[in-house]
């Protein structure tokens, strides 16, 4: 049986974050070895070339003796309850401690951390806050679950005055303590139940973002985001009228304005990102930025010009009076509900929803009510198309097709002037695409080639 040498760190997982962990340990001159549950992980030969002399063990973790490891550091894609790890997780002190990349980051970081989690909108708020900080003149590093891994940011931005980090539940569940200057929990809806078991387990992982936090930003309309045991100042945001101290939307001079309490900040109409869900994102970023001491004028300038991120409610084209919107990042039911709510109030005609893929065990029934109100039809495809059809067909017309290309062809056939075709799948993409970006690009290319490109 292969064995981890004494005083060596064991890195498990050769994904993007796992390789960042390895680079970090190499820079520090700390001895380590690597394991991956896959027999032939992608990028293995390139990793060996970059780290000569580092042992790599592939295959079941039960076949590896980890008892003498200094520490076990997991890539976020590795479930802590994987056989071979679970005993160390369930019985702390029985062997090496099991942590994730963020534990290593926190040990090294000497600048303030702004951390963002939630089932949806993490990337938008992370990017938005990073732009606000830069506009305010701060040296800012942005990454984590978005873009550059957190550990690489330490090397790439050694003079950063602020780290703005998107953090997933997978990252947080292996983070014993974070100590963020401001931490936001944006929303919670069903996702990753195949990893966390149930909503209680999923929420518990997200709640770790508040460990050691000096300030919390939470959703006034979603009590699941509120800290279980607040140990810091808490600021709430809402897209309704705010209470004293909250961020929200008020009527001011005949217009709707973003506001803190009753103090109007800027007209909603000047926020470039459209939709109620994006107004919530703007308010969350403002609340975090205000706590950090960012310039209010700078934050408003960013909101006036920031268009949002690709594949997140992204307007692609209007053709024959029909608008086509790419929300491929809508990989869970909550994200799709937010997209429908954001678009529904501005519809001239009806909505045509394209949904499907790997539902990760989610309940699709919450989609039925808003679709019954707004939609002409739902067109479903992919692995969980049948489950989507069963959840929706009692409330609105549903057509099941094989793939995204067939769904788009059907949408073009039934759409009328004034309608909006929305790709917001409520599912992961991996049954038919490498990732949600590839799915969104297929949507874009199909439109660019007038249906000639394959999806």
Swiss-Prot record:
Protein's job: Cell wall formation. Catalyzes the addition of glutamate to the nucleotide precursor UDP-N-acetylmuramoyl-L-alanine (UMA).
InterPro entries per record: Mur-like_cat_sf, Mur_ligase_C, Mur_ligase_C_dom_sf, Mur_ligase_cen, MurD
Reactions performed catalytically: UDP-N-acetyl-alpha-D-muramoyl-L-alanine + D-glutamate + ATP = UDP-N-acetyl-alpha-D-muramoyl-L-alanyl-D-glutamate + ADP + phosphate + H(+)
Taxonomic lineage from the root: Bacteria, Pseudomonadati, Pseudomonadota, Gammaproteobacteria, Oceanospirillales
Similarity field: Belongs to the MurCDEF family.
Biological or metabolic pathway of the protein: Cell wall biogenesis; peptidoglycan biosynthesis
Annotated GO biological process: cell division; cell wall organization; peptidoglycan biosynthetic process; regulation of cell shape
Name of the protein: UDP-N-acetylmuramoylalanine--D-glutamate ligase
EC number(s) per entry: 6.3.2.9
Residues bound to ATP: 118-124
Top-level taxon of the source organism: Bacteria
This protein's UniProt keywords: ATP-binding, Cell cycle, Cell division, Cell shape, Cell wall biogenesis/degradation, Cytoplasm, Ligase, Nucleotide-binding, Peptidoglycan synthesis
Intracellular or extracellular location(s): Cytoplasm
A single cellular component GO annotation: cytoplasm
UniProt-recorded Gene Ontology molecular function terms: ATP binding; UDP-N-acetylmuramoylalanine-D-glutamate ligase activity
